Design a protein with these regions (language model features):
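Glycine- and charge-rich intrinsically disordered segments
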Residues: 1-4
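Metal-dependent phosphoesterase core characteristic of DEDDh/y 3'-5' exonuclease domains
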Residues: 6-12, 27-30, 36-98, 103-175
Length: 175
């Protein structure tokens, strides 16, 4: 009798961000929406949505590359600098700063919930069964997702949870 093998279930997570602008190095995330879809049945089995409260810029969200800085630049990097929220981007998404202040969740909490969502969406064991990210212009959304998890200090957990590989600079790139 042949050994029984468990059929693998592959999952895609539809990712969509609303943002304060187009540059993930300068602009903030304002809203995230996720949708988990089984690739065998095309069934949507989980959803997540959250507004993200305003937060400050951090070096942790930038790609790791060697950058020479003067002492003055290093000292200046210690102060709070708010992320950009361009009015055109807010108008396009119909999100206001008041909405973000009153309904927005802490960025670190949102990042943790995104990783928890992906763990729930992993329906089979094995590295090849980790969820893949899907969406329209997904490279744009991935940049903001990386900013979110890096700022929250969850980059290692992000790498364990999603399917992906490392680029030339050693940065994890999900696929």
């Amino acid at each position: 009798m042949a050994p029984q093998t468990e059929q693998k279930i592959y999952v895609g997570i539809g990712l969509d961000f609303e943002t304060g602008g187009l540059d993930c190095r300068e602009c903030a995330c304002t809203q995230i929406a996720l949708q988990a879809v089984r690739f065998d049945t095309w069934q949507v089995f989980d959803r997540y949505q959250a507004y993200i409260a305003p937060y400050g810029k951090q070096d942790a969200g930038l790609p790791r590359r060697k950058v020479l800085r003067t002492r003055h630049e290093q000292a200046k990097g210690q102060e709070y600098v708010p992320m950009k929220y361009e009015q055109a981007a807010l108008d396009y998404s119909a999100i206001t700063m008041e909405m973000l202040r009153t309904q927005g969740m802490d960025m670190k909490k949102v990042a943790g919930e995104v990783i928890a969502f992906a763990k729930r969406a992993t329906l089979s064991k094995g590295n090849q069964c980790k969820p893949v990210l899907v969406g329209q212009n997904i490279a744009f959304d991935i940049g903001f997702l990386q900013q979110l998890v890096n700022y929250a200090g969850l980059a290692a957990e992000f790498e364990k949870t999603f399917s992906g590989s490392r680029d030339y600079y050693g940065n994890f790139q999900p696929h």
